[in-house]
């Protein structure tokens, strides 16, 4: 569910960004494929790296297991097989959302109605997430749900930042000031962070401060620090959590100084990549720890 929402957010922010950029600044949609590490699968399916093919790949392609429709299909199957553990209204809501997405996917692929389509998907996801929050017992099922949600959110949050940084690095130096003003405002809005940033940071928006907020703010529910904290807290409510919490704590302790927009360079891009690898490792450890566990395994 988190992946469905975040994919919609990613496409939406990129669409908004390209719409607002000055005409003399050229940006490729294929950047999104690179950020999501989907080059190999994409190039097996498409010869042209244009907007339509990229958006179709991210939203509708059934050969892409991370596409929005593929993710919705997996969510629907997961809810079908766990109906006894989730609120009974969930099955109806996911069916409605899945049906809407399938019947209206052309709106998402075509530019003219994309914004409305993606907003409807995001709202549908938030409705289901709100139902979980208000009606699920805080037992082991809830804690696994929280870990999965915030792992996905942390991963996609770093990829959205990476998309912005890559966009800035690929632009001409003389265009970066103008580009930065648009880019970082859109990034904050894509994470529903614009007002929280203005209230918390209380300065004009720039790359360094926006990135620091989305990486380190302890209270904002889409910041990397908050997501990792939620993963660690949920893990402690389950048995054999030692390896998980150790990996989370190690990631939380690593501080990357960002003093100016010049620090958002290739080294920072590599830092984000390292975080994504660490998140994948935490995900694998969760699988090994609780789903492939054998009596006598260390944890």
Predicted ranges, named:
Residues 1-299:
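Alpha-helical transmembrane segments and their helix-helix packing motifs
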């Amino acid at each position: 569910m988190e992946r469905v929402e975040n994919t919609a957010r990613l496409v939406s922010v990129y669409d908004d960004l390209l719409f607002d950029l000055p005409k003399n600044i050229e940006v490729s949609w294929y950047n999104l494929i690179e950020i999501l590490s989907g080059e190999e699968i994409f190039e097996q399916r498409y010869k042209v790296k244009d907007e339509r093919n990229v958006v179709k790949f991210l939203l509708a392609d059934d050969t892409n297991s991370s596409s929005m429709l593929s993710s919705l299909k997996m969510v629907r199957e997961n809810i079908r097989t766990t109906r006894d553990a989730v609120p009974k209204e969930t099955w109806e809501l996911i069916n409605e959302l899945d049906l809407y997405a399938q019947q209206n996917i052309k709106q998402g692929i075509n530019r003219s109605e994309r914004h409305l389509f993606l907003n409807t998907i995001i709202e549908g996801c938030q409705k289901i997430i709100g139902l979980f929050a208000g009606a699920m017992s805080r037992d082991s099922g809830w804690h696994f749900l929280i870990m999965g949600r915030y792992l996905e959110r942390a991963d996609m949050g770093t990829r959205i930042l990476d998309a912005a940084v890559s966009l800035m690095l690929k632009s001409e130096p003389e265009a970066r000031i103008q580009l930065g003003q648009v880019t970082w405002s859109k990034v904050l809005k894509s994470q529903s962070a614009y007002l929280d940033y203005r209230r918390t940071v209380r300065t004009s928006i720039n790359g360094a401060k926006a990135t620091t907020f989305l990486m380190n703010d302890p209270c904002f529910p889409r910041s990397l620090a908050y997501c990792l904290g939620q993963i660690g807290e949920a893990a402690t409510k389950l048995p054999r959590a030692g390896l998980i919490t150790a990996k989370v704590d190690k990631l939380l302790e690593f501080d990357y100084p960002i003093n100016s927009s010049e620090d958002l360079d290739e080294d920072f891009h590599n830092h984000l990549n390292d975080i994504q690898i660490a998140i994948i490792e935490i995900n694998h450890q969760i699988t090994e720890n609780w789903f492939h566990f054998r009596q006598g395994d260390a944890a």
